[in-house]
């Protein structure tokens, strides 16, 4: 493996000059830079990240704890994170914990050993055990990208779930639906509680009541939505909901599939609105009306906030709030026409 001395010898310069060219720490004549970079390429030289981190007190690496990397919503956020890290010259260590506390402990310890410059935490719900773990690493610049309890010591991304739940339900009501069911995620998750509050507030603003038995608990996965639709379809047709609000697009896809398998039509018989606006939602059959969240922008913003925190650890706490909006496609019938 080539060393910095090999590069210096081939380029006919000192090792100090090679270091300045690679790290861009001092002016070096263009012709000299050209010789150095040609030598680097010819020798396939890779600077020691360990040596550089000891000298500069930075590794130009960021750690990211993720609980559900397979979920399309989180995958799109992660794309925004990775893309912006790359553009800024940072390497991303992505650790998928799947909500396992032992994995979380292991990865936090590993990232600390790697001396990452900062940490992003993206969780489907931030539980107290993970919060306690994170609070033991308060010296590490950190951005929480979660939908759980607040922490005054970290920057945070908020998804504004209550407003999203309100907008989804309001859209259904404005299209003439007064009998609306919803399929939530796990009832104990903060994001679900907030979307239910939005669902209830939209009904109250329209002076409408709702059947609490039509708030059906899912888990953000297809199978739970399919079971929930079975319950809806077991209701006598004349008393059945005309619209269904699913708390993510994956459950909406499963709901549409189940409804169509039963011989009913979407949206003619039952309308469906989703949440997240994942890339696939535009290609559902029918294309899904949903609540948009700026996922890749959220990923980019999280990295921007973290890099500012790395530069200035005493910077005042930042909170970025996503603004949900309705994306109208073809899965909701206007019953007023």
Curated annotation (Swiss-Prot):
GO terms for molecular function: DNA-binding transcription factor activity; transcription cis-regulatory region binding. The gene is purR. Hypoxanthine binds at residues 73, 189, 191, 220, 276. Pathway: Purine metabolism; purine nucleotide biosynthesis [regulation]. One of its GO terms (biological process) is negative regulation of DNA-templated transcription. Residues 2-56 form the HTH lacI-type domain. Consists of two structural and functional domains: an N-terminal DNA-binding domain, approximately the first 60 residues, and a larger C-terminal domain, approximately 280 residues, which imparts the function of corepressor binding and oligomerization. Homodimer. This is HTH-type transcriptional repressor PurR. HAMAP family: HTH_type_PurR. It comes from Aliivibrio fischeri (strain MJ11) (Vibrio fischeri). InterPro entries: HTH_LacI, LacI/GalR-like_sensor, Lambda_DNA-bd_dom_sf, Peripla_BP_I, Tscrpt_reg_HTH_PurR. Gene3D superfamilies: 3.40.50.2300, lambda repressor-like DNA-binding domains (1.10.260.40). Is the main repressor of the genes involved in the de novo synthesis of purine nucleotides, regulating purB, purC, purEK, purF, purHD, purL, purMN and guaBA expression. PurR is allosterically activated to bind its cognate DNA by binding the purine corepressors, hypoxanthine or guanine, thereby effecting transcription repression. It holds the Pfam family Peripla_BP_3. Keywords: DNA-binding, Purine biosynthesis, Repressor, Transcription, Transcription regulation. Residues 4-23, 48-56 bind DNA.
């Amino acid at each position: 493996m080539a060393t910095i001395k090999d590069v210096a010898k081939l380029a006919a310069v000192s090792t100090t000059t090679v270091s300045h060219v690679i790290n861009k720490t001092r002016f070096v004549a263009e012709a000299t830079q050209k010789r150095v970079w040609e030598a680097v390429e010819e020798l396939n030289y890779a600077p020691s990240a360990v040596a550089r981190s000891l000298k500069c007190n930075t590794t130009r690496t960021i750690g990211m704890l993720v609980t559900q990397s397979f979920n399309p919503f989180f995958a799109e956020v992660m794309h925004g994170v990775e893309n912006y890290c790359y553009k800024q010259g940072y390497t991303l260590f992505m650790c998928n914990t799947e909500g396992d506390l032992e994995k979380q402990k292991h990865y936090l310890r590993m990232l600390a050993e790697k001396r990452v410059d900062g940490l992003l935490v993206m969780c489907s719900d931030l539980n107290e055990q993970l919060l306690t773990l994170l609070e033991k690493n308060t010296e590490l610049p950190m951005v929480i990208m979660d939908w759980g309890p607040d922490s005054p010591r970290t920057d945070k991304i908020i998804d504004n779930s209550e407003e999203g739940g309100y907008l989804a339900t309001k859209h259904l009501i404005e299209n003439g639906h007064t009998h609306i069911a919803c399929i939530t995620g796990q009832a104990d998750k903060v994001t679900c509680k907030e979307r239910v509050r939005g669902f209830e507030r939209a009904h109250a603003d329209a002076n409408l009541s709702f059947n609490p038995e039509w708030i059906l608990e899912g888990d953000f996965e297809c199978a739970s939505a399919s079971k929930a639709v079975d319950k809806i379809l077991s209701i006598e047709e004349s008393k059945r909901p005309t619209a269904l609000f699913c708390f993510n697009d994956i459950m909406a896809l499963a709901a549409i599939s189940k409804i169509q398998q039963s011989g009913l039509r979407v949206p003619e018989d039952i309308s469906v609105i989703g949440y997240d606006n994942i890339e696939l939602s535009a290609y559902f059959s029918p294309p899904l009306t949903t609540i948009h969240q700026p996922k890749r922008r959220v990923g980019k913003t999280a990295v921007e906030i973290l890099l500012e925190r790395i530069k200035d650890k005493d910077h005042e706490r930042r909170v970025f709030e996503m603004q949900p909006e309705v994306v109208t496609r073809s899965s909701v019938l206007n019953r007023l026409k």
